[in-house]
């Protein structure tokens, strides 16, 4: 009997210890008190749940002590400690809109929601408030404000990874809601097509990311995430009107008494209609152009929809679309360094009328076992027409299936397949077809609640007409076989040393196949010939970094300081290069012109420092973003006897790069007033093609050598803004760009805008 009693007592004790306790509750927005659907709830970095349409969640946990973490994009993560007995527990949580701290939730680093402090690579996050407050008219200008990033003639460049490419190809992959949005023909970013009116946040991932995102992520990723509605409908309208000031040098002014200006309106509306999420957005913009004939008129409209099925829990489907018609003049090169700086070479600009639209059907299903199936597709159409018979049409079809699983041991597994098919018909490069298939898998695991490890693998295959990916299997110097796929991998680790101190290390490989434009374009621009290169091959590379992120808090102000040392190497790097590529007897200028070539083995090393923060010190609100980047971009195949003949510099430095970049933005608010300042700085661009400064060719492109001798220092440009909140709905702002009217160029023969002023009215209701 005694043994039986002991056995019974032991059995009851085990049952109590292993009992599964029901934990449930709801998650609300702190300001609106709306329930938040789609919040990820994680227990002890292992088990998880996702809130439903009303923000409700439930999960079962063993009795005892646990830590629950609540994560959602656009909000700061919240953590709650609980001690479960044998009864159920009701735990409700409110989430605050994310400030610039380590708790900001991001997605791009691993295709699932993580705290910024946990990611294994360098990342920057831009809030929609900064985009609006700076009176951003195209996404290009706000990306140019990110530390370590600059945009040269429409080409995004992270840590010196790219130079001047005449709009062909991109080493930075642009995503909109996790789907690539590069044009089918040129493989470039259409910045004015991106929806500034509908933003959740912008995530910039620095370093090679091809293992998770594929080709064109060789230098990094920019992910623009749009917003979905909450239970409370939201609407906003922003209207602005601006004018260009006279340039610092009077001789640059080409207009009469009436200065050119710009004006625009954009709107946003979101609401839930039963199970349907609906978002509407639109943008109208008109610019007279500070450069002669460089007009722009554009109209953009977008719709996002998502339907959440009641009968099938976890299933949602929708269609997102964006349409734009834009017309204007395309300024490429100046007509001289003085009176001609704001006038196009030859006296006139190419006039264009372009159409762009994308349609994105998608399907998502969350399983009861914490898995997620998603099918995302995109049709992206671009039509470029102009008055120089250079019509181009591109059709891109994209599909991605992805499965993601959160395991109870803290492991997150993400795997998927992608396929892309493109059709291009153009007067510039005839008719071509391209395809891209890939498969990827990534494992993210958290150990001891401090160490995060990430491993990703991808196999990529690309084909343009008959040219395709080839990977050679080697045994030493001997080739033993070849495959039609290129494997790439990434590995990263992040260790939380202290409460707000994180140390990380990462290594990632990259691979990029040339675009149709880079291989096949044949045209003339302002008297300069651009030649095709059918033998242009793919480029490969890798990047590595070692970084530390230190969080801090001063009163109610929270932020972090991030320092990273990085190194990137590229083999067969593609660059836009000047030389004698044509027939010297029949082609203009004896066959001299530009084309994309593989320049060999290159290396970029440096250090990237970023400082971000947001909060209040007493009654004063402060929002801060800034950084400094030092880069040393060199060729590992540098031959002084040959390269110094082609380059303007005698030093070993890659063309069209800076060694130093500085960025800063600070915004201070008090009661109804808000004032902000931005800064962008760089040193002198040491190396360009010698053609631009050679006296022998000065009749083709006049004034560049003279201009570089005169403006041989770096540049620092400041912007300012001041706003007043008239009431709960209406705000009025005065925005001044290039505050001190400093004259700058982004590349040879391309002078940037003079000082300009804009008045902005914004209404939210």
Locations of regions flagged by a protein language model:
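Short, acidic, small-residue-rich periplasmic hinge/interaction motif at the N-terminus
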Residues: 28-31, 39-42, 71-75, 85-132
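Short acidic/polar hinge/loop motifs at secondary-structure boundaries
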Residues: 58-60, 179-208
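A beta-strand signature from Gram-negative outer-membrane beta-barrel systems
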Residues: 91, 193-238
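Extracytoplasmic beta-strand/coil segments of soluble accessory domains associated
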Residues: 123, 140-179, 183
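Gram-negative outer-membrane beta-barrel transporters
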Residues: 238, 453, 566-569, 591-691
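Flexible loop and strand-edge segments within Gram-negative outer membrane beta-barrel domains
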Residues: 287-302, 306-373, 379-398, 743
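Structural signature of Gram-negative outer-membrane beta-barrels, strongest in the C-terminal barrel
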Residues: 363, 412-414, 430-568, 667
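Membrane-embedded beta-barrel scaffold of Gram-negative outer-membrane proteins
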Residues: 374-384, 496, 504, 537-599, ...
């Amino acid at each position: 009997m005694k043994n039986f009693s002991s056995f019974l007592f032991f059995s009851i004790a085990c049952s109590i210890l292993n009992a599964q306790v029901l934990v449930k509750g709801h998650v609300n927005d702190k300001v609106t008190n709306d329930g938040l659907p789609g919040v990820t709830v994680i227990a002890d970095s292992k088990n998880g749940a996702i809130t439903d349409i009303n923000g409700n969640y439930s999960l079962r946990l063993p009795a005892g002590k646990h830590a629950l973490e609540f994560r959602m994009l656009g909000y700061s993560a919240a953590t709650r400690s609980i001690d479960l007995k044998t009864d159920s527990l009701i735990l409700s949580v409110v989430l605050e809109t994310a400030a610039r701290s380590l708790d900001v939730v991001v997605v791009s680093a691993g295709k699932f929601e993580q705290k910024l402090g946990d990611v294994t690579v360098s990342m920057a996050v831009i809030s929609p408030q900064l985009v609006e407050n700076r009176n951003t008219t195209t996404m290009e200008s706000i990306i140019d404000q990110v530390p370590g990033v600059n945009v040269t003639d429409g080409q995004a460049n992270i840590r010196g990874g790219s130079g001047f490419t005449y709009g062909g190809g991109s080493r930075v992959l642009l995503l909109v809601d996790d789907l690539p949005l590069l044009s089918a023909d040129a493989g470039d970013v259409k910045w004015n097509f991106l929806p500034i009116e509908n933003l959740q946040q912008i995530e910039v991932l620095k370093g090679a990311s091809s293992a998770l995102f594929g080709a064109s992520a060789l230098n990094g990723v920019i992910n623009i995430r749009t917003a979905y509605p909450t239970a409370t409908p939201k609407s906003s309208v922003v209207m602005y009107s601006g004018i260009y000031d006279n340039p610092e040098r009077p001789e640059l002014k080409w207009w009469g008494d009436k200065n050119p200006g710009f004006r625009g309106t954009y709107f946003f509306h979101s609401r839930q209609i039963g199970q349907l999420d609906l978002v509407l957005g639109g943008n109208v913009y008109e610019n007279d152009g500070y450069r002669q004939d460089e007009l722009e008129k554009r109209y953009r409209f977008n719709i996002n929809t998502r339907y959440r099925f009641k009968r099938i829990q976890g299933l949602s489907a929708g269609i997102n679309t964006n349409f734009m018609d834009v017309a204007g003049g395309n300024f490429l090169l100046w007509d001289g360094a003085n009176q001609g700086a704001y006038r196009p070479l030859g006296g006139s600009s190419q006039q264009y009328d372009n159409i762009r639209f994308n349609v994105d059907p998608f399907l998502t299903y969350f399983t009861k076992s914490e898995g997620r199936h998603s099918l995302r597709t995109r049709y992206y159409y671009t039509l470029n027409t102009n008055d120089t018979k250079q019509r181009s049409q591109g059709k891109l079809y994209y599909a991605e299936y992805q499965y993601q699983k959160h395991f109870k041991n803290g492991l997150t597994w993400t795997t998927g397949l992608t396929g892309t098919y493109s059709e291009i018909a153009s007067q510039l490069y005839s008719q071509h077809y391209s395809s891209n298939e890939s498969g990827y898998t990534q494992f993210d695991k958290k150990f001891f609640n401090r160490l995060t490890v990430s491993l990703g693998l991808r196999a990529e295959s690309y084909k343009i007409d008959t040219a395709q990916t080839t990977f050679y299997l080697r045994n030493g110097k001997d080739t033993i076989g070849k495959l039609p796929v290129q494997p790439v991998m990434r590995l990263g680790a992040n260790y939380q040393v202290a409460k707000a101190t994180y140390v990380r290390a990462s290594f990632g490989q990259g691979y990029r196949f040339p675009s149709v434009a880079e291989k096949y374009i044949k045209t003339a621009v302002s008297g300069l010939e651009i030649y095709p290169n059918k033998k242009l091959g793919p480029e490969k590379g890798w990047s590595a970094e070692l970084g530390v992120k230190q969080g801090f808090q001063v009163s109610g102000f929270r932020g972090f300081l991030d320092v990273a040392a990085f190194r990137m190497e590229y083999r067969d790097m593609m660059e836009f290069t000047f030389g004698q590529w044509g027939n010297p007897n029949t082609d203009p200028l004896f066959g001299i012109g530009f084309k994309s070539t593989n320049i060999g083995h290159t290396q970029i090393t440096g250090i990237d420092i970023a400082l971000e923060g947001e909060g209040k010190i007493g009654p004063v609100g402060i929002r801060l973003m800034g950084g400094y980047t030092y880069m040393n971009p060199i060729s590992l195949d540098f031959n002084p006897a040959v390269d110094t003949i082609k380059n303007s510099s005698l030093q070993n430095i890659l063309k069209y790069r800076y060694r130093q970049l500085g960025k800063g933005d600070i915004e201070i608010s008090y009661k109804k007033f808000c004032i902000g300042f931005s800064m962008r700085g760089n040193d002198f661009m040491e190396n360009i093609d010698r053609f631009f400064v050679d006296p022998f060719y000065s009749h083709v492109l006049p004034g560049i050598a003279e201009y570089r001798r005169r403006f041989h220092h770096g540049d620092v440009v400041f912007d300012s803004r001041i706003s007043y909140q008239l009431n709960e709905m209406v705000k009025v702002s005065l925005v001044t760009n290039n505050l001190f009217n400093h004259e700058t160029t982004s590349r040879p023969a391309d002078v940037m805008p003079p000082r300009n002023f804009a008045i902005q009215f914004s209404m939210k209701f």
